């Protein structure tokens, strides 16, 4: 049974949020390396919602990013932090 996603910050729709949570849970269940988890999420989002999505997954990182309005989310699944955003 997977852990629930804990939202920290977001400016996306509830529908897109739920989709990203679902894709991310699938990635965590399917892959062990953080790099592979991030790559899976990025490829899914690029395919379904157009390019260019960026995905950072890890336990310890800082960030300061510019993103398209309505395309940013930061959340946790267990000990892993997920920063997902789209740029033009």
Curated annotation (Swiss-Prot):
UniProt key word Protease: no
Gene this chain is encoded by: DYN2
Keywords of this entry: Cytoplasm, Cytoskeleton, Dynein, Microtubule, Motor protein, mRNA transport, Nuclear pore complex, Nucleus, Protein transport, Translocation, Transport
One GO CC annotation: nuclear periphery
UniProt-recorded name of the protein: Dynein light chain 1, cytoplasmic
Keyword RNA-binding found: no
GO biological process: establishment of mitotic spindle localization; mRNA transport; nuclear migration along microtubule; nuclear pore complex assembly; protein transport
Coiled coil: none
Job of this protein: Acts as one of several non-catalytic accessory components of the cytoplasmic dynein complex that are thought to be involved in linking dynein to cargos and to adapter proteins that regulate dynein function. Cytoplasmic dynein 1 acts as a motor for the intracellular retrograde motility of vesicles and organelles along microtubules. May play a role in changing or maintaining the spatial distribution of cytoskeletal structures. Also a component of the nuclear pore complex.
Biological source species: Eremothecium gossypii (strain ATCC 10895 / CBS 109.51 / FGSC 9923 / NRRL Y-1056) (Yeast)
